Amino acid sequence: MCIRDRDNPEVILESVDKLRQKMEENAAIDDKFLDENFEQIANNSNIPFMGSNKPKVTIIEFFDYNCGYCKKSLDAITELLRSEYDLKVSFRDYPILAPSSRTAAKAALAAKLQGKYFALHSALMNMQGNLNDEKIYEAASYLKIDLNKLKKDMQKINIEEILLENEELARKLNIRGTPTFIINGKIYAGALELSKLKTIIEESMNDS
């Protein structure tokens, strides 16, 4: 009887070992890249942020406006910014879930040019269900954002470049989903509750 390699336990174990080794090698590369480039990544003037200009702890969030777990994280992030921690939270749009994710990301970045990024960001994050163009522009209109200017600014090459940079950065860091947080140079994949975020922040401050 012929046995296919994939049915051979020894071959399967060998494949698993190779995969594990490859993942460890990739993680080492990711860590090295992040160590060497964290300051530049954290302080990119094109990326919207809230908090201190000279923080003790920097949080970078990769998010998607259609991501339910990202929406849940908004409350925790907002609460952290109200706390006594000396923080900076940098928001990296990573629109991977739907075409409307990219539209929403462009709209928020364009709203930044009218001083309304965080207002629109919060409105989009608090919306229930999947986004569409109508919902996005209704939210912008409600916030008294100039829609004609917004739509023109959404087409600007520098806004597309921000999204492409975020996507390239996510690729280099092996970030595959949202939300993903980078906290003082360490990557945390998935949603983090407020208590967990506080623990990570306090440990990071003690280490610095």
For the regions a language model picked out, list residue spans one by one.
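Cysteine-centric redox/oxidoreductase cores and disulfide-bonded domains
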Residues: 95-178, 182-208
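Extracytoplasmic thiol/disulfide redox context detector
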Residues: 4-99, 152-177, 202-208
